[in-house]
Amino acid sequence: IPVGPYLKPDQLFTERQTGLGLIAAVSAYEITGEKRYLDGIKNRLGWLYQHQQHNPDGLGVDGSWRNSWQVHAGNDPPPATDIRGSSPWMTENIIDGLWHAWLATGDKRIPVMITAFGRYMERYGWIDPKVMKEAGVDWRNPCSGPNGQISWYWSSAHATTQQLVAVQSSEGWYSDSHNVEMTLPVAAARYFETDPEQQKALDRRLKQLSSSYDLDCADVSATPRRFNWNNRGVGVVQWFMQQFEAGAD
């Protein structure tokens, strides 16, 4: 996938490549201090900000890095059936990159992007148990308990519930195996969030996700790469939570 800005709705984009690319750029700058890597970070931040805040699909700002499900899945997108949305757990890679970029640059666009995605997740990213009941299917692994959380495999502010359920039933049976990973975007959004009601919502979500910190969940090998996904970027979550408890902004 070429590295660069998101310029058109049918452009191939994955949150994973974009996030890991940003992390690599930050790491290179931290190790070398070379300006070319700092310039690379600034370029990537500009691309991400433009994508999130001024998406070329013209559907407005919802807080995600909205792209095409069909292109994401390797298919040609018929405009009438394209599902404009994003992968919650792949976007964790972007949030991870943004946090490290914040530590390296203090760029003021970063809190805006992170809190916007946190709000998006609260509105569109998590599957309401009522939806599972109405669909007659529960995609969760019982290891997280009866109130275990699960994000959509493909989330959207614009798709119908029927469209999202179809993707979930086809691809998303292991979505909750990424719950530990998903604590990072929630905690990072909570760290930068200034609205008291949003802070409370994110606190509740973190508490709900804590049930996935379970040995039975850790034993599940739904995908061989799951351990890496879940644990690569979330070490800072415990630090975030200490800041919340201490009353830090």
Q: What residue spans do the PLM features occupy?
A:
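Glycan-recognition and catalytic cores of secretory/periplasmic carbohydrate-active enzymes
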Residues: 1-249
